[in-house]
Amino acid sequence: MQLKSTVHFLSLLAYTAAHGFVSDISVGDNWYVGSNPFQDAWKQPSPERVVWSFFDGGNGPVADLTTKNIVCNTNAQAAKLYIDSVEAGSQVTFYWTSWPSGHLGPIMTYLAKCNGDCRDNDPSSLSYFKIDEKGLENGQWATQELIANNNSWTVTLPSDISAGNYLIRHELLALQESSRRLGAQFYPMCTNLKITGGGSANPEGVTFPGAYKADDPGILVDIFNGISDYVIPGPPVYGSGSSSSQNSVESSAKKDEPAGVETPVSTTSSKKDSISTSAESVVSTFSSEPVYSSLVESSSALDAPKSTDAVKSVEAKETTKVEEVSSSALESTLNQLTQQATVTSTLYSSASPSSSPVLSSSKPASTSNPEKLSSAPVTITKTAVATEVYESRDNGEIVSVSIDSKHLPTSNAAAAAPTADNAPAHENGLYVFTVTQFATTTTYVTRAPRTTAVTVFNENVVTQVIVRTEWTQNTPVTVYARPTAAVKAATGNGASAAAEPNTGTGSGGTTPSYVKRYMEKAKDLVKRMF
């Protein structure tokens, strides 16, 4: 789990131009997929999630505190699933896709007991009691801690509450524009939860809308005017819950608490070893226009198989602790992550268009320590990676991926771009993946990138590399690589006609004809696709 946490801030860089949302939730060893406002509304059938879905054309903030949108986000719809059998006193971790470093503010989490099935309840009719909060502490905002902890936030459920169906309402509040009325930006997320065990407590709470007022001191506030004390909006934290940081005690102590409300005794931090960098600094390291490339051949053990039907697995294990990363050192850090991972690479030769896709599965004995098995980075082959977009049809579990580095030629595209007559052995556009889901390893063959362009890199001119390292159900997985000017010139991205022999134009980043041919052939050949 440490490695997953360490690199989680890279997990959905496709959305970094916008705000964040909860992409995943973990309780113990169980992982659950969040609602994706960019995709789920268009999927048929609609994906079944544990997080309430919302849609406003993206994932913008809620500013009007008088509407139902403040409860579970804009036009929220009930989640179809529950996080089942969660013991009172358990920890729940929310994983956000990304969060802009300039969006400073507090983080609050509430619970509300439903009347029967939460899916049948109007969330604005429920009573919410706060179980976690953090605002400004020692000059650092809670959202800054979220980013430093790889866009994850952990809360502890109260141990004395009664069993039943609950909504857990987790929200971030951005205050960069809160010096004006209705400038505060709320990002609430609601999740269905079945709590077991516990005691008999049924805490009284507040309702949404109603709990927040536009002129509350923690909502209408100028955070850039030398602020040292900040009053977190809403009620104090309920007594038996503990926070992921010290602030739960310190913040609630600043408020006038009603008699009988007990503050937590222990608030030990559950922060994991992390990479401290902002998502915005990462965004600046890759081109705003996606560039799609093949893997560069490396000197690693990923050698081509000897025969068409050969499948060879190579495993290498090393542990190198990654302490920090910066945008100027992403490539070297990537090599460290590669060494840290357990690498499983499966090579597949597809010289003949009639070659059958490989599909095999092996399931080792179950283990009582899924902690080790769930560390699942994307496997990288030393110097460069390709931009690929696939969808996982697995059950929301974290998976790892190995990519066949022999798929496309790695020499300069202007000098060696294949034509219809001299395409390389892998002309059918197949990729091979070894997918690891906890204790299960499966080999898949899939087609070329689902996008409209592939650019071949020369290994000498590849620059910064950014990878996404976690796959979840029905969520696109993207690996980014940024080309230099030399690469763009060599592949027809604004280059002369001579640089793009397969299209005859070479202007505006046209797609090479051999790439289009790869993709068309692959559609007919691959039986199992992400």
From Swiss-Prot:
Residues 238-251, 348-368 have a biased composition (Low complexity). Its EC number is 1.14.99.56. Its cofactor is Cu(2+). It catalyses: [(1->4)-beta-D-glucosyl]n+m + reduced acceptor + O2 = 4-dehydro-beta-D-glucosyl-[(1->4)-beta-D-glucosyl]n-1 + [(1->4)-beta-D-glucosyl]m + acceptor + H2O. GO terms for cellular component: extracellular region. One of its GO terms (biological process) is cellulose catabolic process. Residues 238-279, 297-329, 348-375, 492-512 are annotated as: Disordered. Cu(2+) binds at residues 19, 103, 187. One of its GO terms (molecular function) is metal ion binding. Pfam families: AA9. It is an enzyme of class 1 (oxidoreductase). Glycans are attached at residue 150. Keywords: Carbohydrate metabolism, Cellulose degradation, Copper, Disulfide bond, Glycoprotein, Metal-binding, Monooxygenase, Oxidoreductase, Polysaccharide degradation, Secreted, Signal. Residues 312-324 have a biased composition (Basic and acidic residues). Binds 1 copper ion per subunit. Residues 1-18 form the signal peptide. Belongs to the polysaccharide monooxygenase AA9 family. Lytic polysaccharide monooxygenase (LPMO) that depolymerizes polysaccharides via the oxidation of scissile alpha- or beta-(1-4)-glycosidic bonds, yielding C1 or C4 oxidation products. Catalysis by LPMOs requires the reduction of the active-site copper from Cu(II) to Cu(I) by a reducing agent and H(2)O(2) or O(2) as a cosubstrate. Amorphous cellulose is not a suitable substrate for LPMO9C, which may act at the surface of cellulose microfibrils without any release of soluble products. This is AA9 family lytic polysaccharide monooxygenase C. The gene is LPMO9C.
